[in-house]
Amino acid sequence: MSVSKRSALGLVRTSVGEQAVWALVGEGSLRHMTASCITTLELEALPVDRAEVSSYVADVMSGLEAYSSRCAETPGGASWLYVQHVPVRRLITQLVRKLLALSAWPEFAAAPGPVALAPYEGLLGLRDSSSREYRAYTVTWSGVAYALGAQASHNPARSARLRQLTTLHPVRDLAHAPTPSAVSTAEVVALSWSSRHAQTLLPVLEQLAREGRPSVLVDLATDPMERCPTPAGGSITLCSAPLEALTAAGTVPGLHLDTEEPTGADGTVQVGVHTVRLDRLERLAAALLEGSGGCTQPSWRAVVRVEEWFLELLAAVRPHTVLLSNDTSPLGALAAHAAERHGATTVTVQHGAWIPEAVAWPALHSRHIVVMGDRDVAPAREWVRHPKAEIHVLGQPRFDALAGLGREAQHRYLQNLLGAGNESGPERIAVWACQPFGPQRLQAQADIILDGLRRARGRWGLVIAPHPAQGGRVFNRLLRRDGEPRMAVADPRVGARGCLAGADAVVSVSSTCGIEAVLLDVPVLELDRPGDRTLGLAEHAAAHRCRTAVDVAAALDLVSRGSARVPREACDAVCRWRGHSAADVAQLIIRRAEPDIAPTDLIDHQPAGAESGFPWGEGETIR
């Protein structure tokens, strides 16, 4: 989990001719400077206001939308900025954070001015991430200077590190993807490109199969560990998009990658004291979309080819419903647009907890939105884009498997990992449900957890459960530590879901596994460090809020004495789950496909056991 503490560049006040400028220079030269200077690493460590970042990001995206959204469209009519909104918005967020950090430095704030870039530095780069596939793109500091108007005659669009990355290739099975015309007709087409999607959607498709409703599950995962398992029975057809569609790379026709306005006067947007050129942002976005970063960040050319294949599939299968568990990232937004064009109803099932301040794009495009808990209704209502959208509180189909978990078997698995059961082994075991944060962030979280475990009464052990998208090697440095507490890393194929039922406590920052632990009545410690965003479980009295190691130790001591059960109302706020969410979603799909069901045929809150709009149990629909 180690990461370099050095910064390659620094910022120094200098002059070009008679004009004072802030120049990016090699960090080593700062030691001899008498003028105001700072390393870029120090700049990036300056605190910025989250709300201010979000507000400016929204302003920049609105400006870019007006300036450029129709410069490129798919053959099906989807704007490039609609489909690629999430990766572009994330890039803009990095830019805005750096601009606000620059303004937060007192020396620059006292004398703001133009920034001169570092020659030959790429304009786009990568941040450190523990994710196995996801690429954490960023705007370099030279890219920041470029966005503000600096000339970049000798700067490549991509950094050397980014240029060295090869296009991710899907597993070999995708090379034998069926032609759309070979797929039989079905009532529902579902799309998945991660294991969480598959775990959310497959239970629904299996329930539909029991009702005699055939479906097609399209697997778009480019990471072998994220592929869909082969469905049982013959009512669910599993197919994949062709290899060349998912890995295509190339320029974006219509976007100005090689040409720009001489002064950028045709479009600018303000970020505090900084004037950002929209033509430069368009060029940065075009460079970002040239390369394919897998199913989560497909190139523009990959998007166009996937759309063509998917529209052919819809024409052959003729479904009444397209089922998704993400309709905002590129493939999800594309599928929602294609489904609407085809005339199919769109249903999105929330597959993970929402943190309103941290969502990549606060938008939902589907006709029907299935959310987990009562607290998810308000953000869903704010984010819906469909003019006839309905919101349904039906829990989480992926959680239905919790009812059959073997607690004793999972507890034995944890004990075996830690060598528990002997005199020197731990008396109790905590599971840390990890997420693919950057190395420094994970290290800071680990320090608090381990210190808290050491301070707690009794002997606690820790099992680190990697996120499905996370590489296991990131934890090697932690495991080299000597002494207490005893630690181990769960098999990535097991993950937190495969062992949390056997834990004495679960530690989480914002993992959905924290919600699963609440539903299983396993005590949850919600790590609430400065700079981290949590699921807010503690706000509903569903978890112990832990800001420091002392808080962690105190919470573990409460667990040792026997924590009180989480009230039903608190559970429902987080996830209204009764063990049959998949059946409820399946019934929603069936009912909404029937032409005689009026859109006002809503489902109200009802006590358990009472008759409901869904024969399978409770639920609520909000328009």
Model-flagged regions — what are they?
Residues M1-R623:
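Catalytic-core helical/loop segments in enzymes performing group transfer/polymerization on anionic/lipid-linked
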